[in-house]
């Protein structure tokens, strides 16, 4: 299919120094630094890139038939394997009715996640490549916890499920009044959420509070799409409601922690006014 499992070692073997890629990354880093300071340059550059990428994707989408038994998964735009997409994927692997389905994971660095290929029905594509766009055009379902790429739109027979990745205690999208975001103005942020809201079929909310915030953040009431919000909870949280003492013991053992202590997890969110080229928001 998109990735020949038999050639994993060859595909990801050490390669000679790629000077063209290094030059591209240097130019990209330079452009990002300019974009932070010059909003006009940033907006015009993004507009040109979006139009070009959308035209290219539309050509792929128009010639590929949707496959009802192909599902595309992505976590944080391909940066990791986890959260609710992982929970849904791993649940589906245990269900006989999905034995003839094909699962495709999109990653930015596939080499880190080749373990998913242990399942014979699972494949990998690299985000923002032609293979990724072919997978998106083919899959009946898109299961994401972050916004889908702006230039990729679903066909009428495709279902984009927006799982998001948390409760919006911090303002999102249209709820942002003043933006100190390092890479986007308030209007640019709203445009991104506007595009996403026009694409997803469903967005899952973990609570009534979250459901209300999603409606306002994506401006769903104004566009008549409040019915897309499903207050069903996050699949990733099922484990927290059903864990056993053995699960706790396994975690403590794996992290090599003392078993006679109580633990507090501090997990601060990202800061949208801090952005480092090559890394992202920090």
Predicted regions located by residue number:
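A short, charged/proline- and glycine-enriched loop
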Residues: 63-72, 157, 259-262
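Conserved catalytic-core segment of nucleotide-activated headgroup transferases in glycan assembly
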Residues: 80-91, 217, 234-282
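Basic, ligand-binding patches in group-transfer machinery
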Residues: 1-70, 94
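Active-site and donor-binding regions of nucleotide-sugar-utilizing enzymes
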Residues: 70-242
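Acidic/glycine-enriched edge-of-secondary-structure segments
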Residues: 37-49, 73-77, 235-239, 272-273
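Exposed alpha-helical structural elements
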Residues: 22, 112, 131, 246-250
């Amino acid at each position: 299919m998109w990735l020949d499992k038999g050639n994993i070692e060859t595909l990801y073997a050490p390669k000679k120094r790629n000077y063209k890629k290094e030059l591209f990354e240097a130019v990209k880093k330079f452009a990002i630094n300019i974009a932070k300071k010059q909003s006009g340059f940033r907006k015009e550059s993004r507009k040109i890139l979006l139009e070009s990428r959308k035209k290219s994707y539309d050509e792929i989408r128009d010639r590929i038939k949707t496959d009802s038994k192909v599902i595309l998964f992505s976590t944080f735009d391909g940066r990791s394997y986890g959260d609710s997409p992982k929970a849904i994927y791993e649940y589906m692997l245990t269900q006989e009715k999905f034995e003839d389905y094909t699962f495709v994971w999109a990653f930015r660095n596939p080499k880190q996640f080749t373990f998913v290929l242990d399942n014979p029905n699972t494949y990998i594509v690299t985000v923002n490549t032609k293979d990724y766009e072919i997978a998106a055009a083919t899959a009946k379902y898109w299961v994401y916890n972050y916004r889908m790429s702006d230039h990729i739109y679903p066909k009428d027979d495709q279902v984009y499920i927006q799982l998001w990745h948390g409760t919006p205690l911090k303002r999102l999208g249209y709820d942002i009044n003043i933006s100190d975001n390092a890479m986007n103005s308030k209007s640019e942020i709203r445009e991104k959420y506007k595009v996403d809201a026009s694409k997803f079929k469903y967005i899952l909310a973990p609570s009534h509070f979250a459901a209300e915030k999603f409606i306002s953040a994506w401006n769903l009431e104004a566009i008549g799409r409040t019915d897309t919000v499903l207050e069903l909870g996050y699949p990733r949280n099922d484990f927290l409601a059903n864990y056993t003492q053995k699960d706790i013991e396994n975690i403590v053992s794996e992290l090599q922690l003392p078993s006679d202590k109580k633990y507090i997890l501090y997990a601060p969110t990202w800061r949208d006014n801090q952005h480092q080229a090559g890394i992202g928001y920090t």
